[in-house]
Amino acid sequence: MPTATALRIDAGSGASDLGEAIGRLAERSLVLELELTPKPGLVDRANSGAHRDMDVGTFRASIAAISPWFSFFFERGVDGSAVPVEDFLRYIRADGMACERAMFAATLGVNTHKGSVFSFGLLCAAAGRLHGRGRPLSRASVCAEVSHICAGLVKRELLLPAAARTAGELLYWQHGLTGARGEAQSGFATACAHGVVPYLLARAKGMDEERSLFEALLQLMAHNRDTNIVSRGGMEGLCLVQAEARRLLDCPTPSRSARTAQLAAFDQLLIERNLSPGGSADLLAVSWFLANLDELVCKCVA
């Protein structure tokens, strides 16, 4: 079983050190997403958003339980670097399910990070797979590798007979929403275009970490076809969330206090409507991970 890792992100040498550093980067991504406050409809330090069965303590326990697995996924990728790409998802599936069980044990059955287990499991394993083959690691190469690993995933897992449909499969059939599977199959196209790019642009303009994450979150909420929202409020709920996020983004660049007030009001709106953009929260964590991956790899291989 994986052992606990520290939050500190240090660069070391060798596959083991690289895997540990990437695992810590993934953990830090989840911590930053959780601590960002206020987040519309989401669990944060101020409240539980539109959720009734979880709070910030639940999320912290979940992060502590799943984070040790991230470096393990990297190691599995290294060990399985010779596994044909079309078989690799099956190769790591049992490990992903074991990580999910660790999450559920820590949260007493509450689903806090199932999407993140899927996304970061793939990202860390893909990084290990590339490293095991002597391929360079970068944001672009890791996303491309995830896309190769997940080729055909939407068709295989969402186009099932009606009797076998899960909630995610029903959303695909009803609205064409592909959720986390589609995002992974695309190589995290939404996260890259509407999370990584806005975050890096905000940082380049001199915004601090928190402001940059808020701007990235609003961009993701404006563009992501979030299945978490649709499962609660239908397409009408999704349209409401996207429209409000776009309205805030179209405002002239507000002061920190003004943006915080806007986000707090947006939070209350989504709490009243029982809408949670959990998919966009997952993508925000992925976006920060990808935005910082290249710098981390450079430090590790220097």
UniProtKB/Swiss-Prot annotation:
* Lipid metabolism among keywords: no
Q: Which GO terms describe its biological process?
A: prosthetic group biosynthetic process
Q: One of this protein's Pfam families, by short name? A: CitG
NCBIfam families attached here?
Answer: citrate_citG (TIGR03125)
What is catalysed by this protein?
Answer: 3'-dephospho-CoA + ATP = 2'-(5''-triphospho-alpha-D-ribosyl)-3'-dephospho-CoA + adenine
- What are the protein's GO molecular function terms? ATP binding; triphosphoribosyl-dephospho-CoA synthase activity
Tell me what organism the protein belongs to: Albidiferax ferrireducens (strain ATCC BAA-621 / DSM 15236 / T118)
Q: What is its EC number?
A: 2.4.2.52
Q: Would you identify the family this protein belongs to, as annotated?
A: Belongs to the CitG/MdcB family.
Keyword ATP-binding part of the UniProt annotation: yes
Please provide the record's keywords in A-Z order.
ATP-binding, Nucleotide-binding, Transferase
Its EC top class is transferase
Stated name of the protein: Probable 2-(5''-triphosphoribosyl)-3'-dephosphocoenzyme-A synthase
